[in-house]
Amino acid sequence: MDSNTVSSFQDILMRMSKMQLGSSSEDLNGMITQFESLKLYRDSLGEAVMRVGDLHSLQSRNGKWREQLSQKFEEIRWLIEEVRHRLKITENSFEQITFMQALQLLLEVEQEIRTFSFQLI
């Protein structure tokens, strides 16, 4: 993962953790956890693509990697919808900027994971 994407993840996670969204703080914590999980998954897929012959070890380590990939895409879609919803309802400019950047990052990561997965198939 390039340094811009790493810093984008770190920046968004830090800013999201500082937000106080009232009764929805549990939802926000869930989003933060999923962002972190998505980052780790994206990193591991990227590393797998870089290693020669890693498709076979990936398949042997996890026979259900396609199912796992499908689950990650579902998580991304859920996060995109959740971020869009938050963006629509918030009036705080700090939160709007954070959620717009989070949405952009999610769309970029979704595309990167698609690219990696096609290389592994």
Swiss-Prot record:
Its main location: virion. Belongs to the influenza viruses NEP family. Average number present in a viral particle is estimated to be 130-200 molecules. Keywords: Host nucleus, Host-virus interaction, Transport, Virion. Mediates the nuclear export of encapsidated genomic RNAs (ribonucleoproteins, RNPs). Acts as an adapter between viral RNPs complexes and the nuclear export machinery of the cell. Possesses no intrinsic RNA-binding activity, but includes a C-terminal M1-binding domain. This domain is believed to allow recognition of RNPs bound to the protein M1. InterPro entries: Flu_NS2 (IPR000968). It is found in: Virion; Host nucleus. Interacts with protein M1. May interact with host nucleoporin RAB/HRB and exportin XPO1/CRM1. Pfam families: Flu_NS2. It comes from Influenza A virus (strain A/Mallard/New York/6874/1978 H3N2). The keyword Acyltransferase does not apply. A motif (Nuclear export signal) lies at residues 12-21, 85-94. The lineage of its organism: Viruses, Riboviria, Orthornavirae, Negarnaviricota, Polyploviricotina. Disulfide bonds: none annotated. This is Nuclear export protein. GO terms for biological process: exit of virus from host cell nucleus through nuclear pore. The keyword Transport applies. GO terms for cellular component: host cell nucleus; virion component. The gene is NS.
